[in-house]
Amino acid sequence: MKFLDEAKVYIRSGDGGAGAVSFRREKFIEFGGPDGGDGGRGGDVWVEAVNGLNTLIDFRFQQHFKATVGTHGMGRNRTGANGEHVTLKVPVGTQIFEEDAETLIVDMVTEGQRFRLAAGGNGGFGNAHFKSATNQAPDWANPGLEGEEKTIWLRLKLIADAGLVGLPNAGKSTFLAAVTRARPKIANYPFTTLHPNLGVATVDEREFILADIPGLIEGAHEGVGIGDRFLGHVERTRVLLHLVSAQEEDVAKAYTTVAHELEAYDGGLEDKPEIVALSQIDVLDEDELKKKLKALQKACSKKPMMISAITGKGMLEVLRALRDVIVENRSYDDETISQRPKKHRHKLEDRPQHENGPEESEEGEE
């Protein structure tokens, strides 16, 4: 399935039906009086967050969504039928913006969340509503109100527990493929990964979601390369795993380049917990490895972990470190939520070790 994380769509709710001008006509009843019914209400346009979707690709082929109009009122005080609603089904994590692409309307962060984007127009009153002591036979009725129309932007920010960041060819996709059932494209050239990939990792019977985004390069926050476009997908993560390839000539520069881009990106990524790991260590001898590990430790001011997705070395330790941070943050979130006033499979242990080789505003419908 192709990945699309931004879409522009046009929505229009239904017009209300017109009220009817009608008079009661029955045998032997000379002055039956008005009996025009009201028009039906136009349909609404709703958005709903659903599981099982991780792309907005459906909105590439359909950009116009229109609810149906309410039917007109009829004689004998019959009210017209309401128009049918239209619901846009989007992945959990989708944000809805106004046409300016900056004003946030709603953030769809939980499964089943619904929000009304455009309300249908009310139906018009039939002439029976306008009967009075001074006007026993009104010959007019109200037209239905027009529905709302607008252009909106849908922007998807995937919800994952941990995000993988690093330069191109740092081994992020290889890591994701090794610890989850995800099968991202892997090749020995930069920007093999062109869109984010998600996978579910399991360690010690605990599951968490990993997000792999395209590699970052210097100047990414200014639009250089493609990684900056996808940084929004790791904004919601609880921890970042920063991979630095042992094949880099200068591992310290490789680390600081990405760290600078995270800091320059306006999304609070520099404040997230970070685990640093020297990847692809199977390609170096022991002396060279020690030298690069020391340089990386000096650059990041913490002891980096060492991993090889090919041999499996250090992979379990990294997963456990990620799990510990995620569990700690989840516990903090749960505690924070509990203090608020209430309002209305793929296991690494099973992987063979090779010595060589390769997350409506529920507003009910009215």
Curated annotation (Swiss-Prot):
Keyword Cell wall biogenesis/degradation in annotation: no
Residues at which Mg(2+) binds: 173, 193
Biased composition (Basic and acidic residues): 347-357
InterPro entries associated with the record: G_OBG, GTP-bd, GTP-bd_Obg/CgtA, GTP1-OBG_CS, GTP1_OBG_dom, GTP1_OBG_dom_sf, OBG_GTPase, P-loop_NTPase
SUPFAM superfamilies with a match to the protein in the record: Obg GTP-binding protein N-terminal domain (SSF82051), P-loop containing nucleoside triphosphate hydrolases (SSF52540)
GO BP field: ribosome biogenesis
An example Gene Ontology molecular-function term: GTPase activity
Chief site of localization: cytoplasm
Region (Disordered): 333-366
Domain OBG-type G: residue ranges: 160-327
Residues holding GTP: 166-173, 191-195, 212-215, 279-282, 308-310
Domain Obg: 1-159
Cofactor(s) the record lists: Mg(2+)
Compartment(s): Cytoplasm
EC code(s) of this entry: 3.6.5.-
GO cellular component, one term: cytoplasm
Keywords: Cytoplasm, GTP-binding, Hydrolase, Magnesium, Metal-binding, Nucleotide-binding
Subunit structure and binding partners: Monomer.
Function: An essential GTPase which binds GTP, GDP and possibly (p)ppGpp with moderate affinity, with high nucleotide exchange rates and a fairly low GTP hydrolysis rate. Plays a role in control of the cell cycle, stress response, ribosome biogenesis and in those bacteria that undergo differentiation, in morphogenesis control.
Family to which the UniProt record says this protein belongs: Belongs to the TRAFAC class OBG-HflX-like GTPase superfamily. OBG GTPase family.
The protein's name in its UniProt record: GTPase Obg
Gene that encodes it: obg
